[in-house]
Amino acid sequence: MSKNIYVKELSKHLNQEIIADFLVLQKELREGKVQYIRLKLADNSGTITANVWNNAQSISEKFKEGDVIRIKGEVRSYKKQLQLSVKKLKALDEVEFDLVD
């Protein structure tokens, strides 16, 4: 499992599990076959779409747009676009991250 990965490096980790910190630019609770969260995440190297498929409602209540979160998830390709499938997520306190990253 790779840690501290930047958006620009995600293509090197396709189908691998990563742990990384991102700023939440957008958060949307959606209904499909199941309820899920669609996220737009960013770091200083770019942005990426991410999805949270399990326990969407309860996880959605734990963070908001503008928060920095740490995710554990898998880098996937969908319709030739990279995205993250989030397995675990936690909002970080300011002391847990460096805004320069």
Can you describe what each PLM-predicted range is?
Residues 43:
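Flexible glycine-/small-residue-rich
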Residues 26-38, 46-101:
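OB-fold single-stranded nucleic acid-binding module
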Residues 1-19:
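OB-fold nucleic-acid-binding modules
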